[in-house]
Amino acid sequence: MFSYEMHLHCSEVSKCGTSKAEEFVKSYAELGFAGIVFTDHFIHGNTAISRKLPWEERMHAYFEPYEKAKCYAKELGLDVIICLEHAYGNGKEVLVYGDITPEILAAHPEIEKMNIKDFIGFCHENGWFVAQAHPYRKRDYIDMSVPPIPELVDGIEVYNHFNAAEENVKATQLCEQHDLIAISGSDTHNASVCGNAGVVFNKRITNGKELANALFENNFKLIINGEVV
């Protein structure tokens, strides 16, 4: 069995991150995880990448900070996959998993002005898996009057380690009501808080394409509060 963290933020790419990518690599390797999926904040979120950069340069800048961490991860036998978390307004976000490259993103500057329906359509055209992140999280920056979008996504993050228990319960109910695929992610921003969430596959996942395919297959278990269920 192969455990993967599905939701984390490093300080090089997300302003809210407090640990560097290499620190996460070390922590998850020590915990025995097979891999981690970086889901840092994209263009409309709390990104550390300058919005003043030209589009193509900005897309490449989003990926560059991971290169050193990927080399370190290879030494430790840990898979590192680069995906993203996309904010679409009112504090709402989706997690996107797949073969996401700076070349694909750089070729489509229209992404920046897409509404969420068109953005998810673009993701699906590329074979990417889209999950609603923490759909019932209560924070000052989130407009709770704006409902989730189960009709557009492929899955729901039913367990987020930093959500209240009732928020995760409601997310699970939403997922079941719409017959969507359940995923789990810690949403950690610090390498000292790791291993409490994720998914467990029955095979090694080495890249974004394999990850999206495995998620669509829906043949995996979840890590919830540190336990495989």
Features from the language model and the residues they span:
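Charged catalytic cores and adjacent phosphate/nucleic-acid-binding surfaces used
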Residues: 1-14, 20-26, 90-103, 121, ...
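Flexible loop residues that form catalytic
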Residues: 41, 135, 161
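Glycine/small-residue-rich loop that forms an oxyanion/phosphate-binding "nest" at active or ligand-binding sites
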Residues: 82, 103-106
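Internal catalytic-core helix/loop-beta-alpha segment
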Residues: 108-142
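An N-terminally biased module of ancient metal coordination in phosphate/nucleic-acid-related enzymes
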Residues: 1-88, 149-151, 169, 190-192, ...
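Surface-exposed amphipathic alpha-helices with a cationic face
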Residues: 3, 29, 70-74, 117-131, ...
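Conserved beta-strand positions in the central sheet of alpha/beta enzyme cores
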Residues: 36-38, 131-132, 157
